[in-house]
């Protein structure tokens, strides 16, 4: 798949998103900051990536996901948990960054902060019904299928 990419910050020309391994699903996104950003516990910030994408094909979307190491080691996660980039969006990719940890975290310019994953999308059409065909599960949710 070819994805249109617009470079909004010249520093990104030498650090384009790339797959780390042949099996990687995500492309690393960097914090395109001019100076270090200090996030105290509980604080959030909207961090620019210096990049804009245009997926273009309504059969695909992009997801911005956290990097596991930052979340596990430092409590740095996405403020919106998952960022959904629709196929027709053309603005800069921004990363909602939340320090859910107990200590202050300093995010340095050009540090890898999140990852971008391209996923297929199916746009559903509704079929209005009065009742559903009975299933084994029914309306059970929130642990109704048991612990194991």
Curated annotation (Swiss-Prot):
It comes from Paraburkholderia xenovorans (strain LB400). The keyword Cytoplasm does not apply. Pfam families: dUTPase (PF00692). One of its GO terms (biological process) is dUMP biosynthetic process. InterPro entries: dUTPase, dUTPase-like, dUTPase-like_sf, dUTPase_trimeric. Belongs to the dUTPase family. Keywords: Hydrolase, Magnesium, Metal-binding, Nucleotide metabolism. Its cofactor is Mg(2+). HAMAP family: dUTPase_bact. This is Deoxyuridine 5'-triphosphate nucleotidohydrolase.
């Amino acid at each position: 798949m070819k994805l249109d990419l617009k470079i909004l910050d010249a520093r990104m020309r030498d650090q384009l998103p790339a797959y780390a391994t042949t099996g990687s699903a995500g492309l690393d996104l960097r914090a395109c900051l001019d100076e270090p950003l200090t996030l105290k516990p509980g604080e959030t910030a909207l961090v620019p990536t210096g990049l804009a994408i245009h997926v273009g094909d309504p059969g695909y979307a992009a997801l911005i996901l956290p990097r596991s190491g930052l979340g596990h080691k430092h409590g740095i996660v996405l403020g919106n948990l998952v960022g959904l980039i629709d196929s027709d969006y053309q603005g800069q990719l921004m990363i909602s960054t939340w320090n859910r940890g107990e200590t202050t975290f300093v995010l340095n310019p050009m540090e890898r902060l999140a990852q971008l994953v391209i996923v297929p999308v199916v746009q559903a059409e509704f079929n209005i019904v009065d009742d559903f065909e009975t299933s084994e599960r029914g309306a059970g949710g929130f642990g109704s299928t048991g612990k194991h």
